[in-house]
Each structure stands twice: as C-alpha cells, then as structure tokens.
Amino acid sequence: MGFSGIWLNLYVVFGSLMVFERMVVMVVMKAQPLVPAIFIFGDSVVDVGNNNDIYTIVKANFPPYGRDFTTHTPTGRFCNGKLATDFTAENLGFKSYPQAYLSKKAKGKNLLIGANFASAASGYYDGTAKLYSAISLPQQLEHYKDYISRIQEIATSNNNSNASAIISNGIYIVSAGSSDFIQNYYINPLLYRDQSPDEFSDLLILSYSSFIQNLYSLGARRIGVTTLPPLGCLPAAITVVGPHEGGCSEKLNNDAISFNNKLNTTSQDLKRNLIGLNLVVFDIYQPLYDLATRPSEFGFAEARRACCGTGLLETSILCNPKSVGTCNNATEYVFWDGFHPTEAANKILADNLLVSGISLIS
C-alpha cells in the first residue's frame, strides 16, 4: 500500500471514530433513539423471522442458527448471532430490535419502533420469491400498508407517540438482489439462457426504482439501500462456480459490480425526481470483499469456508444440528453459512453503514 493509501485509510478510520463519537453523544443527551423507528425490507440478509411461520423451506429457526444470539436460541436470523441491522438499531440507540411483522410479538408498543418485513429468498424479481414461496417485495409493501393502518391507533393510545412522525422520520432499509442472482438467475436456465446478467440487472433495477417510489408515496423519506455483496466470494458460490484470482469468482463479482453501478445511478435519479427524498446507497461490496480476501487483517482466520458444516455449501435446512464439521468459534470466520456473514463480520459491516448513513439521521 502506498503512502497516500495509508493516509486515506487513516482518514477513514478517524472519520469513522468522529462520526461514532457524535452519535454516542447524541444518544446520551437525548436518552432516546436518534430516529423514531426502523423499517426493514428485503431478503435473508435482514430477515429476522418472517419466514418462520410461512410455507417455505428457506428457514433458519433451528440450531445451530442463533447459537450466539443474545438469547442463544434460533430466531429465524440467517446467522449465528446478530445481523448488521441489529447492530444498526443498537448504534441508533434502540434497546430492542424491530420485530418480524408476521411474528406474534409484532403488536402494541413493539410496533412503535418500526417493523421488519424482510423474507429470506425474496428479491427485486418477483419470480425469485415465488420460486421459494417467500414474501415478495410487493407483498412486503402490502404488509407495510397494514402496519400504517395499525400504527395510527397504537400511537393514539400512547400519548408520546406521533404516527406521522414515525412514518416520515423513520429510517427505511432495503436489502435485496443477492437471492435474485444466487438462488435464481445462475441456476435457472429459463433465465440465464434468455437474458444476459446485464439484462437481468436492468429488470431488477426497474423493480428497485418502483419499490422506492412506492415507499416514497406512502410517506418514507429516509431510505438506505444496500448494494450487492461480492457474490463471487460467497463460499457456496465458490463451491459451485469455482474460485479465480484472489480466491473469488471474478465473473460473479463483475455481475455484482455492474448491478451496483446501475443501483447508484438510479438512486441519484430518484433523489433528483422525488422532492425531499434522502436516499443513501450503502456499499456492502467493498467491506465484505476486503473481509473475504484479507481476513487476517480484520482478525479472522477463515474466509473461504463457512462455519456451519463443511463450510462449502450449507445454508438453511442444510445447516442443521446434524451438520458435520460446524466450527466451535464463529468469531474466527467471515461467513456463518454458505451465503451469510457471521455476527463478527456483521459488526464490521454495520460500522461501515454507520459512517455512510450519517446523513439519514442528521
């Protein structure tokens, strides 16, 4: 790394510390969260249990999932512990996490801090959710509309709560797209024989744009959307496609980069066209790529294999109590299963979100 590169890294580090210190001071002074609520939409990266009670094989409500969570029990999170959005909620000053909207806990005062509508195996492409009987983004939006109708009454019964403020001042997080490629496009001849990855990306971007506009029409003004991760660095992808230079699949990573470029361009267009919209693109690609290709620099011992089972492919029902070879210490691993980061990796990703998302709360 050159001298200028070192200074750039130092600048980023100190900048991050200053932002974090500012947020801590704000939380302490207010003695309450920096925003009234968090609303989460997307796929398995942010699902906290909506798939638990629907008819789908894509679940994570059994061991060893959740073994390192605060309750040491599976919740439906595709992780050994906390998700990046859980850490984000903590960083913003919340003492609890937004509940899965389909869970029994999603009622009364619990809904005053927002809700999680995400569903594993969902995506921007409706066919992805349909393939796995997951909750599509349009369906998630319908659940959000139901939330809006419920929160008015709940807020009225709590004198310190204002329903309109919850909606307009809350932060909305959208994380989707990975399942569209990994769990659909790359394995579906009806798609990859008919469309190039670039053409498929265009379809996803159209869906993304429509979703953001619909959220905006319902009152959302502070929205953060994540980029695709380095798809070619996911252990399951490496197992199926094979590694290339740097240990990751260059082809899959290039597909992710192409999509992310379109996501950034479209997001800028949306900000220009929708008055008052604060839309931030969270770069997940680079920080996770750094973890996957230089794990030792971040305190990890393994990034090619996941913790669960053999670490080559297992996820969801294939990552279960009978999976042979599951690691004892997930903090040494970047990935928990074939597709999802460990809690330790999620903490690092959340710290990156903290810096890039400061404009959403200021």
UniProtKB/Swiss-Prot annotation:
Any one biological process term the GO annotation gives: lipid catabolic process
Sites where a glycan is attached: 159, 162, 264, 329
Family: Belongs to the 'GDSL' lipolytic enzyme family.
EC top class, as a word: hydrolase
EC number: 3.1.1.-
The entry's keywords: Glycoprotein, Hydrolase, Lipid degradation, Lipid metabolism, Secreted, Signal
Signal peptide: 1-28
Record GO cellular component, one term: extracellular region
GO molecular function: hydrolase activity, acting on ester bonds
PANTHER family, per the entry: GDSL ESTERASE/LIPASE EXL3, GDSL-LIKE LIPASE_ACYLHYDROLASE FAMILY PROTEIN, EXPRESSED
SUPFAM superfamilies per record: SGNH hydrolase
Active site, per annotation: 44, 337, 340
InterPro entries membership: GDSL, GDSL_lipolytic_enzyme, SGNH_hydro_sf, SGNH_plant_lipase-like
Descriptive protein name: GDSL esterase/lipase At5g22810
